[in-house]
Amino acid sequence: MSWTYLLMLLFLLPYTGDAVPKINDGEDRVTVNVGDKVSLECRDAHLVTLAFQKSGLMKKPRDLKSRPLNNSETDQFFVIIKADLRHIGRYICTNTETQENTSVSLFVKDPARPFLDIPFIDVTEGADTVGMCFPTDPDMDIAIEKCDGSPLPENFTFTTDIEAGITIKTVQLAFDSCYVCSGNKSGTVKKSSTFSIHVKPVPKKVPTVFLSKSRQLVKTGEPFEVTCAVLDVFSTVKAQWLDVKEGVTKQANFRSSNVFSYNLTLKSDGVPYSESRTFTCQAENAIGQVNATFTLDVIDVGYVNLTVLENTTISVNAGDNLVLKVYIDAYPHPDDGVWTYFNETLLNTSDHYVATKDEGNNRYVSELHLIRLKGTEKGVYTFYTTNSDDDASVSFNIQVKTRPEILIAERTSEGTLQCVATGFPVPAIQWYFCPGSEQRCTDYPPLSPVNEKFIQENSSLGRIVVESTIDVNDLKKNGTVQCVASNEVESAYSVFSFAIKEKLRTHTLFTPLLIGFIAAAGLMCIAVAVLMYKYLQKPKYEIQWKVVEEINGNNYVYIDPTQLPYDNKWEFPRDRLCFGKILGAGAFGKVVEATAYGLLKEDSRLTVAVKMLKPSAHSTEREALMSELKVLSYLGHHKNIVNLLGACTVGGPTLVITEYCCYGDLLNYLRRKRDSFICPKFEDNSEAALYKNLLNTRDMGCEGMSEYIDMKPAVSYVVPTKTDKRRSGSFGDQDVSVSIPEEDDLALDTEDLINFSYQVAQGMNFLASKNCIHRDLAARNILLTHGRITKICDFGLARDIRNDSNYVVKGNARLPVKWMAPESIFHCVYTFESDVWSYGILLWEIFSLGSSPYPRIPVDSKFYKMIKDGYRMMSPECAPLEMYEIMRSCWNSDPLKRPTFKQIVQMVEQQLSDSKGNTPLPYPVSHVPLDHAVRINSVGSSTSSQPLLTNSDR
């Protein structure tokens, strides 16, 4: 690189008053290239100095050497050996005596660096920026822009100067950002490196002060701690605990660019005071100061105080819910307390549960929730709690109002009529007489009783019985006597019919006839009792699906299906149903194939399944079918459950119209497909020998014939094509009546089995999201329709469980024991987790192609012991290892460790995706949104769930 010598002769003319030094040839700007040598000569009659000004600061460069010029005592010679960007600025030659000066600007051009680098600029809000975007080439037009190319902020104004660079006027907080300088010379644009402008906010209000607590109660000698948090826009804020010299720790940090946090913690390991004190935290900035006060209450000994806002004597109607609430003011922290009823501790059950909460400031609340109070549950309920220093208790006297009940209504041997009644409040008994035979006599004047007395039973809060009698000898004619027991709740009555007869002469045949009559009556009573016992032993039809209303620990409160609303939009005209063949029949009713005309749209025909009861059905069974209809309408539509299409509830017996599933139940479908199943070989199948001949044997002697019953076709059977079999609809227009389950001619493989598992998991996830427990999940209760779509159903109506070996007698019920979780078998507990266990058994059924669970193991005492000891079935031959691991997780003895159905959907979906080689799934994934409370945890500590009914529904 060639050297360029620049001689700047600064002549200071002989002092003649106000003469000012001039630059040679009047030049005030000099431009050189980077690396050039620069020489400066400053001449004057007096001693001169050379200064360097940059960014408004006077600072002499370290490498700027000076020496006398030509041995002059006044003139100076300055040399920059190798010019670089550090030397850019204004050089000022000053007469030390007169302070007159002249100056020249030096620019050092560097093509690689068009601007001087600046990493960041700190500026106070409202001020102007200085010292940025200095160009190295004075011939450039300079500007400023944001790093990302976005527009400059609103009100962003700036001025440019070739020496001073760019000055931003009146900086605002919105200007805090990243910027870059740009220069344009002859159409060529060059940019600087990026830099940041940090805007320091100016306080506009006093600081904000928060205390971690405003008050604390301690005993003498106990520790305490309180933190004062101060928030301001800048770190110049001052904060302190007044009149506190020790025990204060400080911590400061920026929460964001415009918020500064300052924490002062006041702490003591042991309160040395014997009385209460206050402490003040003070914060101050340029606007002003603010104080926050903390009160420390000091006591010598702890306490427990109980408060009840309502009356402790409470009357409530039987069947109502009641909440007893006690407010606890205590220090130190009390125990949870206990509720007792006649000195017996109350534990959480379906009839009552306890809820506690901490309201802060040493105040707590304990609530006893009494659900659907019975008349026998009146009495004294007591709450007791204690801490290390004190204890207290409070009692409630609960009176349950019950309707009157007539216990005895008879004619005594003394010729009187006796009426004994009970209830709360104690009922009043009135007697009425009317001539002839009547149902009621209350329109006649009351009779005066001969005697009336009260009988107290058990304790002072036990049942009170009132007894009243009248003398029938005072009645002169035949008629009806009515005993009426009334209180403010309701009335009850009993009627006596009698006739006044002449005294008859005793007949010699009277005694033998009486004995014969009594003997015949006794035999008849015995026969009636036997028939009644057998009737009660018969299984009753009830819907298996249960909708959970509330959960407290392990106790489930199920909603009464009769309380669910029924929307008349489901009504469908009976005359538009054309019934076909019977699809299934059981002890209580049957399912019939039918054609519905105009169900979905006008002039359409749709094959449906219709549930109906037998003509001999009792009122309880009719009510159960109506409950099933209400539950199905409450659940709503889902692809993987048998959906409700309509109903007929007026003008005849109740009919429930549901989707028709052409392939029948999954259990028999799998058995029919055994010969055509393509089974890959998996490793580590310990039970392979058990299923070695599975695909070669059709006569398996399988248990439980719960499928659609086999029947002869009424018309020629039409074999659908492959295209028909794979269509995805759940139902469609059908022109051919089918009396037996259709069959597709496609083979079955492992991917199909995984898909069945996936669809059932989706359906169960949907039921769980609706707080619905199935209680009888098995392959026999899964139906299959076109496209091999599985649908969960409840087949209890059309199944004769008395002749189904899958249902084992246990107590007075027949239960599917091999599908039940241990807690359901041994404790009669049905939860979402017990459904997960049953799902694991269903997986085993699917991958064993319809074999019965626990093969060759009868349900007896040994079976129950095996389940208690943790016995689990081995993997079916056709099950991938991953699917067997899902089965095992469903069979965890701890219900809390079983996966939820949402997790099962994800696990099986992954297996289905892997079996397809990570290609898109052929079946749509319909994840169920949990639009109300997340799935209720039946074994955890969840308190309560969202109600399923509003008050108006009840």
UniProtKB/Swiss-Prot annotation:
Origin species: Xenopus laevis (African clawed frog)
Topological domain ranges for the Extracellular compartment: 20-512
Residue span(s) of domain Ig-like C2-type: 21-109, 118-200, 207-299, 308-401, 404-499
Residues that hold ATP according to the record: 584-591, 611, 659-665, 780
Modified residues (Phosphotyrosine): 556, 558, 691, 708, 807
Taxonomic lineage from the root: Eukaryota, Metazoa, Chordata, Craniata, Vertebrata
InterPro entries given in the database record: Ig-like_dom (IPR007110), Ig-like_dom_sf (IPR036179), Ig-like_fold (IPR013783), Ig_sub (IPR003599), Kinase-like_dom_sf (IPR011009), Prot_kinase_dom (IPR000719), Protein_kinase_ATP_BS (IPR017441), RTK (IPR050122)
Protein encoded by which gene: kit
Pfam families: Ig_PDGFR_d4, PK_Tyr_Ser-Thr
Protein's UniProt name: Mast/stem cell growth factor receptor-related protein Kit
Annotated signal peptide: 1-19
